[in-house]
C-alpha cells in the first residue's frame, strides 16, 4: 500500500529532522493504528459525554484522513494527535486554552465552529439544553 510507504518515509524524516512544531526530538511518532487505539483507550478515563464525543471525533478524523498521501500532511496529522494523546494522558484537557497565534491561524468558519462548540459545552455544563 502506497500510504504505508509514504507514512514510513515521513516518520523517518521527522525522526531524523528532530523537531516538528512543538514536538521534542526524543519522541518519535507512533504508527497510525497504534496511535488511534491508544487515544480510544485513553478516552476510557474521560467522563461519559466527553468520551462519546471524543471517540466519535477521533474515528471520523482518522477515517477522513485514511487516504492522504502527502507525507508532510501525514506527519502533521500524527504529530497533532500524538500531542493530544499526551495532553489527555496527563489530564491537561480540562485546563486547555487556545493561544492567540492558533486562533489567528484559524479560518472564519473554524472560529465559528469553535464558538458554537463552546456554547454547546457551556449549556451541557450548566445542565440546560
UniProtKB/Swiss-Prot annotation:
Keyword Transferase recorded: no
Q: Which UniProt keywords are listed?
A: Chaperone, Gluconeogenesis, Mitochondrion, Transit peptide
One matching Pfam family, short form? Complex1_LYR_2
Q: Which residues form the organelle targeting sequence per the record?
A: 1-21
Q: Where in the cell is it found?
A: Mitochondrion matrix
Give the UniProt entry's GO cellular component terms: mitochondrial intermembrane space; mitochondrial matrix
InterPro entries recorded: SDHAF3/Sdh7
Q: Superkingdom, according to UniProt? A: Eukaryota
GO terms in the biological process aspect are: gluconeogenesis; mitochondrial respiratory chain complex II assembly; succinate metabolic process
| Assembly | Interacts with the iron-sulfur protein subunit within the SDH catalytic dimer.
What is this protein's function per UniProt?
Answer: Plays an essential role in the assembly of succinate dehydrogenase (SDH), an enzyme complex (also referred to as respiratory complex II) that is a component of both the tricarboxylic acid (TCA) cycle and the mitochondrial electron transport chain, and which couples the oxidation of succinate to fumarate with the reduction of ubiquinone (coenzyme Q) to ubiquinol. Promotes maturation of the iron-sulfur protein subunit of the SDH catalytic dimer, protecting it from the deleterious effects of oxidants. May act together with SDHAF1.
Q: What's this protein's family per the entry?
A: Belongs to the complex I LYR family. SDHAF3 subfamily.
Q: What is this protein called?
A: Succinate dehydrogenase assembly factor 3, mitochondrial
The organism of origin for this protein: Kluyveromyces lactis (strain ATCC 8585 / CBS 2359 / DSM 70799 / NBRC 1267 / NRRL Y-1140 / WM37) (Yeast)
